[in-house]
């Protein structure tokens, strides 16, 4: 895999490999290092993968050679091109195409997800490259965002065929390899598979990543990730169209035989929305049979001949696919002719489709004579035009090589083993052209390249152009850098006052080979254009319909303030929301309106590494056993607490720490977060619905419009919440008053009356306390309350004045708290027999009832079920069948009129209610009849 991370550190001269000057390091591995090099003849930047063969075993060495063999077979505009293979006794040098804009993984991490139109164009390029490989019986088996590179024009380049292999139709493969988040379920299960179906699954994951900016299958550990892949369940965000969802679901099918084929993907409705137009191939690719000399680019061959390179040896190298210095120079010159036409040594730049072979030869010979001039004619450009005449015997003596701990870098000492042919000159470095193109600067994601007829450009250049102010304005914002645009279109754009038409397109695959190269080193930093709107945004703003193509569109300088707002709007649009829901589309309800966008991108993830033997994941997990389980169980309570009390951003941060902890315990796994946080939050939504609703942390930016059905559901939820709150308050009140359900004996239980000879007054503590719990109907009260009107429905239940205390006394308060749906209490048990001479004591029953008296007396006789103790003076006034009664205050007693027998059933059918006495600031409870 070729990487383009970080700034390159220029090292002119000291380190060389063959014709290449090493300018920096792109990446390092265990047994290899990737260097950024520049060919001294063609001035083309390349990526050089230096492999230490002495550190590889036979299996890995065979894998390297197979990768080289596959790359030699492939020649596609969206596949990294192999230029040269150099091999010594212990080292192997692979010179490949250099993708300047790096991985699309990093692009998504920095810029967010792609819109579906742009993702479709990228996916068409990926699909064409994979179809090309499958047509040559080659399967990649490691398609992922890290292996999809972006060239100067933001076009896709597939890299890293390390897991690639050959396949035959109908034969199954049995090497279970790949990157876990992109691997198909049959790989995890250890089943034999067909290669193309494996790539189809990986392409489905890649398409999901392009559109959503996150992975469909993810997990903190490899076994969890494996389980989710085998389940085949993933979330669809609200911003994804139904056609795109249908395509992804048809690609991510667990049964390999039911997945879409490449031909079916090309015919899918979502893909047909925007189909790239195939332009004529200017430089036809080599056929399977041996090409003749006429099938090679004559212009490049003549130029090589002018540089002193034997044309016959070059043709033989190309026919034999030797990939030596001759072939490398030819490939690099062809590539420069395609991409850097502005700096290619041609006297008059004409459209390649209009040139004749004889014209090519004449122009090449004429220009080659000027290229071969001595370097001394151009003293200021000594560095650009320096001679590359390389004496093979004095290369090592001319330079001193720095020492390094990396054996791959130390292998540069073996330069004398790499034979280089004699070359008499070199080309100029690619420089921006003299003529200025009128264009609009834009983000790299929507870079476009103007393709203008060469004849239109020559007229009116000297006249005053009003659009120069627009050009100067854009130049100041980009640091005096001018950028051409990498996409060619069939739309015409007219610059104001210039009278020139620009042909532009939304499809990066239609890149014109006649467009000028003016990217330079500006594309190394993808963030310098963030505040400027794309040309496509301006075009769409002036069109009434997205599908409408207007032949004349005027462009004006944009306001910097509006550009900043446009940039913020675009960045907000590219962020994926956090509340995906499984099993349904989030856009089906209004709950997704105003969702706070999350800041979770691929930059928070560790890059996935391809591994072998993915089918042994479960076995490895069982062997780890106790090491993995505590990690998984320890995360659950932490996430439960976070989901109800912490903001979403803190949840994301803490879950990242949990994921990193898991990764430290399992270093061989690939800890990735992405949708893992969303997945865990979704799993916690159902059990924590009520705490989430009461959480002060806002989840939505604004109140969404509520439908009638939602309002009804919220009303029911509110009623249920109030019921639960009142029930909890009632239980707390019972516990406070020392009333427990276990203290009420059942109807079949009877309590004996023990003898109590000691006075009850000596047993009472200074403050009120009960040795036995009272029933909910009668409870002690510390204050005297007046008669309340709510008792008027019981006319016979009148209060009597207390004999020892002046003033009336209200009945003791009930403990209930406005309870709804309260069940009536069970009937009380019959009173136990009592000995006549025994002193009465407090009893314990379910509920206090009003018993009928045995005699018709004006003073009621209280049954033995009462358990209010009184003093000795009051006890003498009661018969032996009466029970002493206490209200919590000494020397006080209360008497009640008995209830009629016909009123008892109604009493038991009542429920408890409460009323507030405003005079005493107390709560009085009673039984209210149900209606």
Swiss-Prot record:
PANTHER family: MAP/MICROTUBULE AFFINITY-REGULATING KINASE, NON-SPECIFIC SERINE_THREONINE PROTEIN KINASE. GO terms for cellular component: cytoplasm; nucleus. Changing residue 587 to A: Reduced interaction with 14-3-3 proteins in response to cAMP signaling and, thus, still able to inhibit TORC activity. Resistant to inhibition by cAMP signaling and, thus, still able to inhibit TORC activity. The modification Phosphothreonine is found at residues 25, 175, 484. This is Serine/threonine-protein kinase SIK2. Its cofactor is Mg(2+). It comes from Mus musculus (Mouse). The lineage of its organism: Eukaryota, Metazoa, Chordata, Craniata, Vertebrata. It catalyses: L-seryl-[protein] + ATP = O-phospho-L-seryl-[protein] + ADP + H(+); L-threonyl-[protein] + ATP = O-phospho-L-threonyl-[protein] + ADP + H(+). The keyword Metal-binding applies.
């Amino acid at each position: 895999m070729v990487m383009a991370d970080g700034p390159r550190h220029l090292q002119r001269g000291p380190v060389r490999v063959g014709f290449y000057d090493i300018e920096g390091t792109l990446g390092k591995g265990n047994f290899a290092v990737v260097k950024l090099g520049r060919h001294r003849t063609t001035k083309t930047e390349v990526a050089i993968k230096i492999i230490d063969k002495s550190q590889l075993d036979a299996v890995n060495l065979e894998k390297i050679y197979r990768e080289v063999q596959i790359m030699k077979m492939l020649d596609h505009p969206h596949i990294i091109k192999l230029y040269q293979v150099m091999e010594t006794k212990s080292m192997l040098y692979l010179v490949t195409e250099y993708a300047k804009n790096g991985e699309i993984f990093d692009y998504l991490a920095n810029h967010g997800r792609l819109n579906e139109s742009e993702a479709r164009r990228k996916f068409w390029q990926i699909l064409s490259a994979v179809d090309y490989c499958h047509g040559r019986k080659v399967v990649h088996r490691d398609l992922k965002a890290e292996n999809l590179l972006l060239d100067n024009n933001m076009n896709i380049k597939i890299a890293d065929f390390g897991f690639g292999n050959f396949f035959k139709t109908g034969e199954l493969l049995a090497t279970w390899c790949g990157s876990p988040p992109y691997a198909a379920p049959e790989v995890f299960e250890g089943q034999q598979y067909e290669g193309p179906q494996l790539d189809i699954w990986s392409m489905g994951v890649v398409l999901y990543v392009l559109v959503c900016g996150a992975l469909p299958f993810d997990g903190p550990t490899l076994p969890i990730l494996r389980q989710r892949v085998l389940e085949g369940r993933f979330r669809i965000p609200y911003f994804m169209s139904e056609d795109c969802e249908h395509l992804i679901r048809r690609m991510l099918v667990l049964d390999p035989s039911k997945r879409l084929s490449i031909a079916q993907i090309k015919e899918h409705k979502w893909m047909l929305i925007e189909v790239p137009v195939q332009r004529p191939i200017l430089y036809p690719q080599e056929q399977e049979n041996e090409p003749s000399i006429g099938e090679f680019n004559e212009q490049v061959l003549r130029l090589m001949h002018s540089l002193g390179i034997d044309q016959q040896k070059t043709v033989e190298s190309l026919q034999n696919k030797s990939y030596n210095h001759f072939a490398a120079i030819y490939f690099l010159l062809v590539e420069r002719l395609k991409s850097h036409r502005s700096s290619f040594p041609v006297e008059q730049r004409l459209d390649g489709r209009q040139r004749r072979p004889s014209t090519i030869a004449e122009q090449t010979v004429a220009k080659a004579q000027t290229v071969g001039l001595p370097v001394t004619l151009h003293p200021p450009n000594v560095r650009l035009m320096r001679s590359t005449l390389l004496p093979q015997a004095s290369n090592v003596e001319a330079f001193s090589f720095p020492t390094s701990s990396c054996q791959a870098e130390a292998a540069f000492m073996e330069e004398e083993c790499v034979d280089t042919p004699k070359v008499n000159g070199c080309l100029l470095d690619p420089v921006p052209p003299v003529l200025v193109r009128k264009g609009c600067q834009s983000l790299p994601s929507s870079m476009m390249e103007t393709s203008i007829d060469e004849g239109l450009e020559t007229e009116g250049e000297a006249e005053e152009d009003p659009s120069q102010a627009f050009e100067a304005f854009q130049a100041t914002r980009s640091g005096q850098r001018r950028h051409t645009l990498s996409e060619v279109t069939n739309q015409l754009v007219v610059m104001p006052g210039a009278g020139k038409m620009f042909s532009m397109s939304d499809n990066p695959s239609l890149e014109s080979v006649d467009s000028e190269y003016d990217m330079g080193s500006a594309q190394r930093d993808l963030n310098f254009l963030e505040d400027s709107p794309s040309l496509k945004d301006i075009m769409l703003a002036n069109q009434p319909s997205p599908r409408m193509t207007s032949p004349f569109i005027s462009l004006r300088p944009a306001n910097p303030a509006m550009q900043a707002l446009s940039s913020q709007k675009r960045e907000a649009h590219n962020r994926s929301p956090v509340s995906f829901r499984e099993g349904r589309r989030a856009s089906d309800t209004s709950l997704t309106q105003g969702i706070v966008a999350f800041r979770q991108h691929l930059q928070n993830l560790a890059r996935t590494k391809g591994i072998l033997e993915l089918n042994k994941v479960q076995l490895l997990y069982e062997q780890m056993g106790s090491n993995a389980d505590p990690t998984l169980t320890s995360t659950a309570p932490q996430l439960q607490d976070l989901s109800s009390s912490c903001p979403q951003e803190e949840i994301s941060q803490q879950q990242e720490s949990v994921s990193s902890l898991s990764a430290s315990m399992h270093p061989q796994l690939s800890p990735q977060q992405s949708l893992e946080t969303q997945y865990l939050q979704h799993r916690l939504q159902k059990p924590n619905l009520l705490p989430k609703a009461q959480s002060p942390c806002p989840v939505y930016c604004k109140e969404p419009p509520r439908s009638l059905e939602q309002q009804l559901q919220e009303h029911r939820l509110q009623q249920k919440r109030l019921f639960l709150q009142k029930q909890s308050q009632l239980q707390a009140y019972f516990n406070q008053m020392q009333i427990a359900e276990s203290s009420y004996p059942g109807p079949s239980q009877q309590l004996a009356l023990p003898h109590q000879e000691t006075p009850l007054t000596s047993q009472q503590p200074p403050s009120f306390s009960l040795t036995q719990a009272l029933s909910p109907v009668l409870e002690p009260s510390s204050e005297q309350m007046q008669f309340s009107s709510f008792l008027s429905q019981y006319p016979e239940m009148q209060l009597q004045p207390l004999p020892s205390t002046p003033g009336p006394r209200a009945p003791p308060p009930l403990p209930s708290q406005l309870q709804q749906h309260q069940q009536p209490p069970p009937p009380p048990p019959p009173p136990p027999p009592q000995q006549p001479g025994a002193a009465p004591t407090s009893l314990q029953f379910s509920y206090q009832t009003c018993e009928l008296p045995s005699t018709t007396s004006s003073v009621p006789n209280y049954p033995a079920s009462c358990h209010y103790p009184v003093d000795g003076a009051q006890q003498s006034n009661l018969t032996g069948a009466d029970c002493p009664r206490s209200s919590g205050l000494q020397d006080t007693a209360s008497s009640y009129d008995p209830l009629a027998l016909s009123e008892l059933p109604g009493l038991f059918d009542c429920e408890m209610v409460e009323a507030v006495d405003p005079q005493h600031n107390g709560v009085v409870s009673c039984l209210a009849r149900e209606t």
